[in-house]
Amino acid sequence: MTAPTPEFRNKKQRKQQVKLRTPGKAIAKYVRMSPRKVRLVVDVIRGKSVSDAEAILRFLPKSASEPVAKVLNSAKHNALHNDEMLEDRLVITAAYVDAGPTLKRLIPRARGSANILKKRTSHITIIVGERNDTRGGKR
């Protein structure tokens, strides 16, 4: 016998019931940096503990480390406040950078022509979760 499926009156009720919330998630949108350059920083901290990642970002000589550190701090505080996780067990479960809209600007060139300068933007997403300690378990 299967469990009866709940019936919802409207789309909003269904979203509230079925909503799968990602714990400790933070997104920074429309950051005025190239996604290619921000990915260099995000690749360094992916999979590390939050305290290690904060220390790495503090001393990393890249301008993209500042907005990534802000997003990481926001994700950490979301996990601590909203989901009541323990700070010393937090680890970066997912971190990725998507390309945002590109601003196109014209640069005048010789003989009345022009080149297009693409000012790229990024969307930075960091998801933080608790570490699963599988060490010391039964064999």
Curated annotation (Swiss-Prot):
CDD domains: Ribosomal_L22 (cd00336). One of its GO terms (cellular component) is cytosolic large ribosomal subunit. Residues 1-21 are annotated as: Disordered. It comes from the Bacteria. GO terms for molecular function: rRNA binding; structural constituent of ribosome. The keyword Acetylation does not apply. GO terms for biological process: translation. It holds the Pfam family Ribosomal_L22. Keywords: Ribonucleoprotein, Ribosomal protein, RNA-binding, rRNA-binding. InterPro entries: Ribosomal_uL22, Ribosomal_uL22_bac/chlpt-type, Ribosomal_uL22_bac/org-type, Ribosomal_uL22_CS, Ribosomal_uL22_sf. The keyword Metal-binding does not apply. HAMAP family: Ribosomal_uL22_B. This protein binds specifically to 23S rRNA; its binding is stimulated by other ribosomal proteins, e.g. L4, L17, and L20. It is important during the early stages of 50S assembly. It makes multiple contacts with different domains of the 23S rRNA in the assembled 50S subunit and ribosome. The globular domain of the protein is located near the polypeptide exit tunnel on the outside of the subunit, while an extended beta-hairpin is found that lines the wall of the exit tunnel in the center of the 70S ribosome. Part of the 50S ribosomal subunit. Belongs to the universal ribosomal protein uL22 family. This is Large ribosomal subunit protein uL22.
